Amino acid sequence: MAINNQRIRIRLKAFDHKLIDISTQEIVDTAKKTGAQVKGPIPLPVRKERFTILISPHVNKKARDQYEIRTHKRLIDIVEPTDKTVDALMKLDLASGVDVQISLS
């Protein structure tokens, strides 16, 4: 029994781009094996957070360090998912460094 006219949208976030690419490929392979149509993965813009920290405690305002955190994002749409697709995605074990958000529409 297929879920008619529905779409599963999966958003992935991670700091490591290799980790998010591996997780994305696992999701796409799982969805295709169960007979669902997959659109994506679509790379979304990378969010860059920069922090500037003073090195010395009192003087030397010019002495600073800069750090950056990059958050990589991907979007996957699974069109016309079957019951097997939903079950397989629920059982899928992804890496711990990847944040997964799933929405049905």
Swiss-Prot record:
Task: Name one molecular function that GO assigns to this entry.
Answer: tRNA binding
Task: Decide whether keyword Ribosomal protein is in the record.
Answer: yes
Q: Which GO terms describe its biological process?
A: translation
* Pfam families (alphabetical): Ribosomal_S10 (PF00338)
Q: Does the keyword Ribonucleoprotein apply?
A: yes
Any one of the GO CC terms: ribonucleoprotein complex
Keywords for this entry?
Answer: Ribonucleoprotein, Ribosomal protein
On the tree of life, the source organism's domain of life is: Bacteria
Q: What does this protein do?
A: Involved in the binding of tRNA to the ribosomes.
UniProt family annotation: Belongs to the universal ribosomal protein uS10 family.
Complexes and interactors: Part of the 30S ribosomal subunit.
Q: What is this protein called?
A: Small ribosomal subunit protein uS10
Name the species this protein comes from.
Francisella tularensis subsp. tularensis (strain SCHU S4 / Schu 4)
Upper taxonomic classification of the species? Answer: Bacteria, Pseudomonadati, Pseudomonadota, Gammaproteobacteria, Thiotrichales
The gene it comes from is rpsJ
